[in-house]
A protein has these predicted regions:
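Lipid interaction determinants
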Residues: 1-86, 97-227
Length: 227
């Protein structure tokens, strides 16, 4: 069954949902912190379905690491990659705050964004305030032709020939011209410390292809196109 058949035969709207003005694909225009600093360079994508969120955060393209065999990455390159962010989590709206359930699937081994968001929409701009006042984010809805809104959460992806679990957990969101995909790791990685655990692990694993593949066997992708 493909997505077009799924839409035709099983299209449904859940009983509970975030507001319609929160749905779609947003890119972050800026984040300003309480210390006065503002970041307008980091590439941040937010895709929102009725009940869950996909998030991707990458440095500017010039600072992104080029693909190569695992054993060829330097410690410096591994540390850049270990700072990438991608995650999927259930979201709950109470009329003022958007809360994310403890991040279900994340490249990082700890939750970097623990606060809920106070959200307000103005035209194509959505403002997110942290309740503590630590930061404010300016999100911009990306233009799109009318199209389907699909939100599917992944239980697991399994190789039908070998029965091997390739990915466990994640999700797919399609909203008009855009799509986002998260594929979780097949096995849980145990963090030995509360913060920056992934960075610590990749330093130790530098040159070890098997370990690095295990740590980075996680995907977050955003694309533009048509189903």
């Amino acid at each position: 069954m493909n997505l077009s058949e799924l839409l035709t035969q099983y299209s449904q709207r859940p009983d509970q949902s975030v507001p319609d003005w929160m749905l779609g694909y947003f890119k972050r225009y800026s984040i300003s912190f309480a210390d006065g600093k503002t970041d307008v360079l980091t590439n941040v994508c937010w895709l929102q379905s009725r009940n869950f969120t996909l998030d991707l955060r990458l440095p500017i393209r010039a600072q992104q690491v080029k693909s190569k065999p695992w054993e060829d990455y330097s410690v410096e390159e591994l540390l850049v990659m270990a700072d990438y962010e991608g995650w999927e989590a259930l979201s709950e709206w109470d009329g003022e705050l958007l809360k994310w359930c403890e991040t279900d699937n994340s490249l990082q081994l700890h939750n970097r964004w623990i606060e809920p968001g106070i959200l307000k929409r103005f035209g194509n701009c959505m403002i997110e305030l942290s309740p503590s006042g630590a930061y404010v984010e300016d999100w911009r809805l990306q233009p799109s032709r009318p199209g389907p809104l699909i939100g599917l959460r992944l239980i697991e992806e399994r190789n039908v020939e070998t029965n091997e679990v390739c990915h466990k957990g994640g999700g797919l969101i399609i909203c008009g011209d855009y799509a986002g995909l998260v594929l979780g790791r097949p096995q849980e990685i145990n963090a030995r410390q509360q913060y920056n655990a992934l960075r610590e692990l990749v330093i130790e694993a530098q040159g070890n292809s098997k370990k690095l593949e295990e740590y980075f066997k996680f995907e977050t992708s955003v694309a533009k196109g048509s189903i």
